[in-house]
């Protein structure tokens, strides 16, 4: 039997070694100058780069110190609007990523753009294979449609008043012109859209099976994206 002081001393040394390992594993690295091409601007004191990859309009915001493993949050639509979440994660060492999918409404065309951008970031820049998805309003369509196809690539989902059914918005809650853009993006007639079962509300099973955590911020009085419909 070991004496109590000896046991405590060994426990202390073991605990100290464990924390040293944790600090080494998760210690941040300083962002390298010249890693990103394109136009450099300021995003709330962080460096933002606007550039084109494979015909896609892209944005990256770089943390001052990059967390181990290169974690990142992927913003869908309305880049720069209400940036509190992005700023908080930048301070934690996350990159912020964005690729333009305007007027594609989470369609297969939008998913293809996201697939290509994901491949570029993970293969060319060593980003984490799992990302955090953030969608505001209509951004809900692409984050959920992409996640349903790629649940193994998603850490978690944060959505603010997300559109989860295009039969709610833009079909019922927007202009005829916007609804037609949505139909064109999906290459459907309205009759086909009404029979369509590929909206986020139809495809939650893959996310549940993968154990992906979801956080929604909603307003019960929201008339543009009604909670009951989405």
Say what each PLM segment does.
Residues 40-45, 162, 167-206:
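Mobile cap/lid helix-loop segments that gate and shape the active-site cleft of serine hydrolases
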Residues 210, 215-218, 222:
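Short beta-strand/loop motif that positions the catalytic acidic residue
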Residues 212, 226-230:
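Short alpha-helix in the alpha/beta-hydrolase fold that links the catalytic acid
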Residues 140-151:
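Short glycine-enriched nucleophile-adjacent loop
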Residues 105-126, 145:
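Alpha/beta-hydrolase active-site loop
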Residues 31-68, 175-186:
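A domain-start/cap signature at the N-terminus of enzymes
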Residues 116-137, 151-153:
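Gly/Ser-rich "nucleophile elbow"/oxyanion-hole loop immediately N-terminal to the catalytic nucleophile
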Residues 81-97:
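Short amphipathic alpha-helix adjacent to the substrate-entry channel of hydrolases
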């Amino acid at each position: 039997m070991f004496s109590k002081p000896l046991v405590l001393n060994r426990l202390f040394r073991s605990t100290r070694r464990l924390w040293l390992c944790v600090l080494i594993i998760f210690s941040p690295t300083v962002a390298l100058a010249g890693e990103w091409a394109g136009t450099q601007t300021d995003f709330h004191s962080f460096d933002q780069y606007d550039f084109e990859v494979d015909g896609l309009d892209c944005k990256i915001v770089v943390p001052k110190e990059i967390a181990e493993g290169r974690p990142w949050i992927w913003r869908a639509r309305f880049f720069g609007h209400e940036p509190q979440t992005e700023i908080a994660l930048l301070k934690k060492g996350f990159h912020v990523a964005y690729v333009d999918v305007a007027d594609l409404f989470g369609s297969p065309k939008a998913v293809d753009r996201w697939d290509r951008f994901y491949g570029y970031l993970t293969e060319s820049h060593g980003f984490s294979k799992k990302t955090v998805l953030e969608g505001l309003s209509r951004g809900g369509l692409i984050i959920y449609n992409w996640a349903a196809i790629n649940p193994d690539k998603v850490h978690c989902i944060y959505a603010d008043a997300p559109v989860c059914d295009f039969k709610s918005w833009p079909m019922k809650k927007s202009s005829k012109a916007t609804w037609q853009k949505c139909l064109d993006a999906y290459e459907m007639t309205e009759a086909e859209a009404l029979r369509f079962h590929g909206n986020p509300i139809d495809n939650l099973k893959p996310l549940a099976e993968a154990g992906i955590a979801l956080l929604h911020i909603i307003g019960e009085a929201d008339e543009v994206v009604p909670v009951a419909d989405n």
